Swiss-Prot record:
Residues 1-14, 24-41 have a biased composition (Low complexity). Pathway: Porphyrin-containing compound metabolism; chlorophyll biosynthesis. Residues 421-443 have a biased composition (Acidic residues). One of its GO terms (molecular function) is magnesium chelatase activity. It comes from Oryza sativa subsp. japonica (Rice). Residues 553-751 form the VWFA domain. One of its GO terms (biological process) is chlorophyll biosynthetic process. The gene is CHLD. Residues 407-418 have a biased composition (Pro residues). Keywords: ATP-binding, Chlorophyll biosynthesis, Chloroplast, Ligase, Nucleotide-binding, Photosynthesis, Plastid, Transit peptide. This is Magnesium-chelatase subunit ChlD, chloroplastic. Gene3D superfamilies: Magnesium chelatase subunit I, C-Terminal domain, P-loop containing nucleotide triphosphate hydrolases, von Willebrand factor, type A domain. Residues 1-41, 397-448, 665-684 are annotated as: Disordered. InterPro entries: AAA+_ATPase, BchD/ChlD_VWA, ChlI/MoxR_AAA_lid, Mg_chelatase_ATPase-dsu, Mg_chelatse_chII-like_cat_dom, P-loop_NTPase, VWF_A, vWFA_dom_sf. The keyword Endoplasmic reticulum does not apply.
Length: 754
């Protein structure tokens, strides 16, 4: 276990920030908490004390339960959450998720060795056991029969007294592996049971195992897009509906989602992060003393874990009790309309899209109040909810205006003179009204913060929170679905099965057997010879659905005409070789199409071979006319042909030109037909080029225009080409191969994440 991280603690570290270290009793927390029944609290504390402390690990064997030794009371020898140095925001968020599993999930980003997984497993070990209905495949709660899976109501068992049979199990902890298929995630046909019974029997997936527990996804940014979308759809709905392979089944799925990822290995798509309530970073800076303490406690844990468990035993037990009691308080916590208005205004000022920010923030604020043993939401709860939910989603203003000192409003004019008796009566009334107003204002001050975290321009008022928000901005991905995978039925990684469309190239044996399993009993009865053990018919056949990483194709369209042609060709050659040298892992391909004279030619077809590129680019032809339209149209043809081959997901054309053309497209494609035709005007040539640029945009191809025209004679037409094609434009009259390569890589990176 890699415990030498910067987020591990020393010397009796605290699980919670100082304000929430202990769960307050009703008599000491707030007036609302004081009104809670004392017998209720005593009963809950007794239940918490008598509950078994073990926790359950998933039946998939991801985390086996430990036995014996000093750590047996904690399950396996996890690193206790109370021993983690710092990371108060993340630890608070994890406790909130333990209190309310349906809070919306928690995403933790951070570099390697920042205790992301350590904290997730540490929280799981603190969760109390759960009561489930005997025979349930999805950990059904006996108190909520309306949420049971289909068919369970007809299969439940009762004891001699007529009571529903239940059992106490450890809280599930299910980890989603990166290579998981949809069948294993949502469930599929149980082949063995279906063969024996002759009917279709459902085999639950990991989502059924995770219900009412913890669903942990490590490196969610590397999870397959289809799987991640399916996963979050099910968690959002709270129910898994399976309609496939003759199965029609549904079961509840409401676990606590904890997702972790390293932003250096790829960002998470923005729409996925938007569907997770709390998004925090573990990369916050630590002091020198904290880093020393982290190494110290990690070393102690490796040498003697019993001592570390003993150090934080009190903190851990308090937190366990706090979770149990807070779950009961949460049922009675209320949030006022004025408080909701405050959260909505913060979300608006922060530039949050949609309504998820304020919805999640309201739920978090209620959980914070329940954690303190209160039935009302206070100011600190609202502020903390904004920091945990709204702040990471905010769109920071690039140039926030400095706050100006606001002048107080002028005093009202003095009232007109009145007689003494009426003045005394009015003074008495005003004193009574003032007392009522003071009481109301005092109560109101406890519920609504005096100032917003965001100012009217979207900037952050509290400078201490600026770094926290900037971390969220850096790890935020971009919207959209990237074409980084190519799906086929013959090459790649097996990700699922599908009904065949024509001849089957690769048979999905597992899916075929699942489809045939329910009919084995009937087919055996019809078989008179009794010679076969498994009967598979053509209608049972399933083909493999494969996926492989798709590279991008960069097509350099280079103006090889004029006096500067040789420089442009040399720079394009250098940029192409630089891209090829770095394209081994990304599978990117490069092509070069120079245009000169009357037409363009493919000097280097799409290739990943550096040797081939050097051989093809050894001689660089230059001089002659400038058939720009033919160069761009040739690039479109090459790109579309490469896309049809199935090896390219994205196409980008890099046009290195001054935008000046003097050869028409018709002359390039059919020189004999235009031999006697009059020479086209400059405007006709421009219209022809812009028409080709429009076709580039319609074909879904990205265009990067590098303008090499001298600024003293510039016409700006190269920029117009980029505008029509919805592409990017750089004015680089003296660009070197390194500059062109850097500009291309930047545009290519944006293209892949768009």
């Amino acid at each position: 276990m890699a415990m030498a991280t910067t987020a591990l603690s020393a010397s009796l570290p605290r699980l919670l920030p100082p304000r929430r270290r202990r769960f307050p009793t009703p008599s000491s927390s707030s007036p609302s908490a004081a009104s809670t029944s004392t017998s209720r609290v005593v009963r809950l504390r007794a239940a918490a004390a008598s509950a078994p402390s073990e926790v359950l690990d998933s039946t998939n064997g991801a985390i086996p339960s430990g036995k014996g030794g000093g750590g047996q009371q904690y399950g396996r020898e996890y690193f206790p959450l109370a021993a983690v140095v710092g990371q108060d925001a993340i630890k608070t968020a994890l406790l909130l998720g333990a209190i309310d599993r349906e809070i919306g999930g928690i995403a933790i980003s951070g570099k390697r060795g920042t205790a992301k997984t350590v904290m997730a497993r540490g929280l799981h070990a603190m969760l109390p056991p759960i009561e489930v209905v005997v025979g349930s495949i999805a950990n059904a709660d006996p108190n909520y029969p309306e949420e049971w899976e289909e068919g369970l109501a007809n299969q439940v068992q009762y004891d001699a007294d007529g009571n529903l049979k239940t059992e106490i199990i450890k809280t599930p902890f299910v980890q989603i592996p990166l290579g998981i298929t949809e069948d294993r995630l949502i469930g599929s046909v149980d082949v063995e049971a279906s063969v024996k019974s002759g009917t279709t029997v459902f085999q639950p997936g990991l989502l059924a195992e995770a219900h009412r527990g913890v669903l942990y996804v490590d490196e969610i940014n590397l999870l397959d897009e289809g799987v991640s979308n399916l996963l979050l759809n099910v968690l959002t709905e709270g129910v898994n509906i399976v309609e496939r392979e003759g199965i029609s089944f549904r079961h509840p799925c409401k676990p606590l989602l904890i997702a972790t990822y390293n932003p250096e290995e790829g960002s998470v798509r923005e729409h996925l992060l938007d569907r997770i309530a709390i998004n925090l970073s573990a990369d916050l800076p630590m002091s020198f003393d904290d880093r020393v303490a982290a190494v110290d406690i990690a070393t102690q844990f490796q040498e003697s874990s019993k001592e570390v468990f003993k150090m934080v035993e009190e903190e851990t037990e308090v937190a366990k009790t706090q979770i149990i009691l807070a779950r009961e308080y949460l049922k009675d916590v209320a949030i006022s309309t004025e408080q909701l208005k405050y959260l909505v205004m913060e979300a608006i000022r922060g530039g949050c899209q949609g309504h998820r920010a304020e919805l999640y923030a309201a739920r978090v604020a209620k959980c914070l109040a329940a954690m303190e043993g209160r039935e009302k939401v206070y100011v600190d709860d609202l502020k903390k909810a904004v920091e945990l939910v709204i702040l990471p989603r905010s769109i920071l203003s690039d140039n926030p205006q400095e706050q100006q000192d606001q002048q107080p409003p002028p005093p009202p004019p003095p009232p007109p003179p009145q007689d003494q008796d009426s003045q005394e009566d009015q003074d008495e009334d005003e004193e009574e009204d003032q007392e009522d107003d003071d009481e109301e204002n005092e109560q109101q001050d406890q519920q609504i913060p005096e100032e917003f975290i965001f100012d009217a321009e979207g900037g952050i008022v509290d400078e201490k929170l600026l770094f926290f928000a900037q971390q969220a901005q850096r790890r935020r991905g971009k919207a959209g679905r990237a074409k980084n995978l190519i799906f086929s039925s013959d090459r790649g990684r097996y990700i699922g099965s599908m009904l065949p469309k024509g001849p089957i190239r690769r048979l999905a044996v597992d899916a075929t057997l699942r489809a045939a399993a329910p009919y084995q009993k009937l087919r055996r009865e019809k078989d008179r010879d009794k010679t076969r053990k498994v009967f598979v018919e053509k209608t049972d056949m399933r083909a493999k659905r494969m996926a492989r990483k798709a590279g991008a194709l960069v097509i350099f369209v280079v103006d090889a005409s004029g006096s500067m042609a040789l420089n442009r060709m040399q720079n394009a050659k250098g940029a192409a070789l630089k891209l090829l040298a770095e394209s081994y892992t990304s599978r990117d391909q490069v092509s070069i199409i120079p245009f000169r004279g009357d037409f363009a030619e493919v000097l280097l077809p799409p290739s990943r071979s550096i040797a081939m590129a050097r051989n093809r680019l050894e001689k660089l032809p230059c001089g002659g006319g400038s058939p720009l339209a033919h160069g761009l149209s040739t690039a479109v043809r090459v790109g579309l042909n490469a896309e049809k081959s199935g090896d390219v997901g994205r196409i980008m054309i890099v046009a290195i030109t001054d935008g000046r053309a003097n050869v028409s497209l018709k002359k390039s494609t059919d020189p004999e037909a235009t031999s006697d035709a009059p020479r086209p005007s400059s405007q006709e040539l421009k219209d022809e080029i812009l028409e080709v640029a429009g076709k580039i945009y319609k074909a879904g191809i990205s265009l990067l225009v590098i303008d090499t025209e001298n600024k003293f004679v510039s016409t700006g037409f190269a920029k117009e080409i980029a505008r029509v094609a919805q592409g990017k434009y750089y004015y680089l009259p003296n660009a070197s191969d390194a500059v062109i390569s850097a500009a291309t890589k930047t545009a290519l990176s944006d293209l892949k994440s768009s």
